[in-house]
Amino acid sequence: MVENTKKKKVEEIERCPECGSTNLIRDYEHGELVCGECGAVIEDAYIDQGPEWRAFDSEQNESRARAGSPMTYTIHDKGLSTDISWKNKDSYGRSIPTRNRAQLYRLRKWQKRIKVSNAAERNLSQALQELERMASNLSIPDDVKETAAVIYRKAVKQNMIRGRSIEGVVAGALYAACRITNVPRTLGEIASVTRVKKKEIGRTYRIMSRYLKLNIMPSKAEDYISRFCSKLKLSMDTRNKALEILRSAENAGLTSGKGPTGVAAAAIYIASLMTGERRTQRAVAEVAGVTEVTIRNRYKELTEKLQLNVEQ
């Protein structure tokens, strides 16, 4: 109910809460609702709520309504099972007699046990609950959760779970899904909602991508600009300047072999100095999940190679 209310509120947003502009950009690729004037990321879990079906004639158009929830990989039984209602009412809405409620209670209990009747199903159920928790804390869109669930299921089939914690494998699958769907989340952000160290998540992710042959393109520094700038409360001018610096750096071959978050952080830091919206290296480093040393190194490379006139 809370989730439905949240989605409704997102759909009803007409003005930017920061500057009041009505120029809102709905970026479905990255799951973000961005202000076109000041660059604020108003919502970072924005997804298209419209139907995914297509109709080619009037008959198909009439038959598009669903009789239930669609199949999903984020539930261990793919959402295909049914539950006995806890409302203690029959199909006509009449209350169940008191003498029959104990029997109904036992039926519910056994149905719940049967749904996860063996160790493999219990493992999968626990893992997908953990995935839901992580994704909720990071405001991950539903399509990314679906991708992560599919990756985890493949890892189970390949017997990659043995010797590893469920939480670590789920975290690796979620990070891989974010990379595949171009929804930028850093390893540090994933690690912040788990009890698994960032290094272990990275190792699990690399093993998964190799053995499952995941088609993952290298992440780009520009994918992180909008979210980092929004967290730092920087204007659209600073965001555009950071993107301009990044494009110049890419053309000059300065981003090759460098961590995208570090390059993005340095570009934002330089842009904030150039536009007069000064942010400290520490503030930028905390948002980007990198060290101040990384920002200083990237800052020096970019300003020298691109001959940028920046006053610190």
UniProtKB/Swiss-Prot annotation:
One GO MF term, please?
Answer: DNA-binding transcription factor activity
Which residue ranges run through the membrane?
A: none
Which keywords does the record carry? Answer: Metal-binding, Repeat, Transcription, Transcription regulation, Zinc, Zinc-finger
Zinc finger feature spans (TFIIB-type): 12-43
The Gene Ontology biological process annotation of the record reads: transcription preinitiation complex assembly
Q: Which Pfam families match?
A: TFIIB, Zn_Ribbon_TF
Check the record and name the InterPro entries matching this protein. Cyclin-like_dom, Cyclin-like_sf, TFIIB, TFIIB_arc, TFIIB_CS, TFIIB_cyclin, Znf_TFIIB
Binding positions for Zn(2+) per the UniProt entry: 16, 19, 35, 38
SUPFAM superfamilies cross-referenced by the UniProt entry: Cyclin-like (SSF47954), Zinc beta-ribbon (SSF57783)
The UniProt entry annotates sequence repeats at: 129-212, 223-304
Any single Gene Ontology cellular-component annotation: transcription preinitiation complex
Protein purpose: Stabilizes TBP binding to an archaeal box-A promoter. Also responsible for recruiting RNA polymerase II to the pre-initiation complex (DNA-TBP-TFIIB).
* Family stated for the protein in its record: Belongs to the TFIIB family.
Q: What is this protein called?
A: Transcription initiation factor IIB 1
Organism from which the protein derives: Thermoplasma acidophilum (strain ATCC 25905 / DSM 1728 / JCM 9062 / NBRC 15155 / AMRC-C165)
Q: Lineage of this protein's species?
A: Archaea, Methanobacteriati, Thermoplasmatota, Thermoplasmata, Thermoplasmatales
Gene for this chain: tfbA
